[in-house]
Amino acid sequence: MKKIILLSLLSALALTGCSAKEDSTTKSSSAPKQSSATDTSSEAAEAQKLREQYKDAMTNENANFPQLSKEVAEDEAEVKIITTQGDIRLKLFPKYAPLAVENFLTHAKEGYYDGVIFHRVINDFMIQTGDPKGDGTGGESIWKGKNEAIDSGNGFKNEYSPYLYNLRGALAMANAGKDTNGSQFFINQSKKDLSKQLPTDTFPAKIIEAYKNGGNPSLDGGYTVFGQVIEGMDVVDKIAATETGDKDKPKTDIKIEKIEIIKE
């Protein structure tokens, strides 16, 4: 895992699709596209920005890791996911993941998630939902068919930040590989303390400490983290503990009744 975060941030390489817990996602081959000078310049600028942010996250004692506070800051949004098992309150991070947050909030406002089931649940790993088809193969971003610059048809791009991690309670976009974000999302639920496995020259000290409470550090760098549970982890644990059948689908449907936007 050494240097995995920095390498992932700078190269934007996804680790695995959330369609499998530990195995890799098979991607279809395609001819490489020619990059323009503008694209190359933009990517270089973005990589440099990430390097600077990563250095700040690793060396600045006052670096801000918003997941570590339950307070909702002025530049954060707040929502409540009302499920058939109880309510989950989260704060969202538009500063660090603007596309994912806008996509989520727009879908929520339009009722896209109303009645959608948690189609994949693995105790001590995560709970996944957001697919109107209910089988893990559906769901689209708000830009599909409307803005090819953001969503070419396969989903919108991953957003990486050295200030956000797959800690216990972290809200993240599910994907089937690099830049394939649609509407599906998951909440990290693992309670295992993996902090001792994390290299101190790769993970910020505050994040290593936070991982003592659980989470999935192996997913860092492969998925867009865009929110954090601030109330209702007992509900997340309850959903995670439900009896499942084929493909980790709960035997009794657990649904999102609606998503209430408390603060944008």
Protein language model regions, located:
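Cyclophilin-like peptidyl-prolyl cis-trans isomerases
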Residues: 6-7, 18-264
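Sec-dependent bacterial lipoprotein signal peptides
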Residues: 1-16
